Amino acid sequence: MDSEFFQPVYPRHYGECLSSTPAPSFFSTHMYTILIAIVVLIIIIIVLIYLFSSRKKKAAAAIEEEDIQFINPYQDQQWAGVTPQPGIAKPAGASTGSAGKPVMGRPVTNKPVTNKPVTDRLGMAAGGPAAASAPAHPAELYTTATTQNTASQTMPADENLRQRNTYTHKDLENSL
């Protein structure tokens, strides 16, 4: 009785509804995303080039002005009181100054400032400030270590080589 109300309704031109439309291409659907990504990459590249070029310019300017300080705590003391002679070039990285002038950017220590940085360092290494201030012959600051071959001179050459760590070409020839 109510079956006429529940009948499926088909459009007159059923084929028109089922006609296929071409699928959009990947580029057309993501065109704006791709363009934004390209623009962002170009901006990043430009910023990186600018940063690296400014670093190179700053480094070149620092080298020209000799602002680069090498790690040498005795650098300013080494040339203190030395007057430059005409025609003689100063070593690279050396700066002139006085021993009483404070050195900027270096840690403050209780070490006495002298014009003998090499002997001061050796004296400090040998026994501290007391040893450094004591008058010592420069040869006493250096020690020499002698090594001896522990292998007996009477044992065979191949046994001698077995006990040693390093070999020379002559040692290997003699063992043959």
Curated annotation (Swiss-Prot):
Q: Tell me which domain of life the UniProt entry assigns to the organism this sequence originates from.
A: Viruses
Keyword entries, A-Z: Apoptosis, Cytoplasmic inwards viral transport, Host cytoplasm, Host cytoskeleton, Host endoplasmic reticulum, Host membrane, Host-virus interaction, Membrane, Microtubular inwards viral transport, Transmembrane, Transmembrane helix, Viral envelope protein, Virion, Virus entry into host cell
What is the topology of this protein in the membrane according to its UniProt annotation? Single-pass membrane protein
Which InterPro entries does this chain map to? ASFV_p54 (IPR008385)
Main location class: virion
| Localization annotation | Virion membrane; Host cytoplasm, Host cytoskeleton; Host endoplasmic reticulum membrane
Ranges annotated as biased composition (Low complexity): 123-154
Q: Which GO terms describe its cellular component?
A: host cell; host cell endoplasmic reticulum membrane; host cytoskeleton; membrane; viral envelope; virion membrane
Q: Does the keyword Transferase apply?
A: no
Q: Does the keyword Lipid metabolism apply?
A: no
| A GO biological-process term | microtubule-dependent intracellular transport of viral material towards nucleus
> Which parts of this chain are annotated as the region Disordered?
82-176
Induction annotation: Expressed in the late phase of the viral replicative cycle.
Pfam families in the record: ASFV_J13L
Ranges where the record places region Interaction with host DYNLL1? 142-154
- List S-S links within the chain: none
What parts of the sequence cross the membrane?
32-52
What role does it play?
A: Inner envelope protein involved, through its interaction with host dynein, in the intracellular microtubule-dependent transport of viral capsid toward viral factories. Seems to induce caspase-3 activation and apoptosis. Plays a role in virion morphogenesis by recruiting and transforming the host ER membranes into the precursors of the viral envelope. Involved in virus attachment to the host cell.
Annotated family: Belongs to the asfivirus envelope protein p54 family.
Outline the subunit composition. Answer: Interacts with the host light chain cytoplasmic dynein DYNLL1; this interaction is critical for intracellular microtubule-dependent virus transport toward viral factories.
- Its recorded name reads Inner membrane protein p54
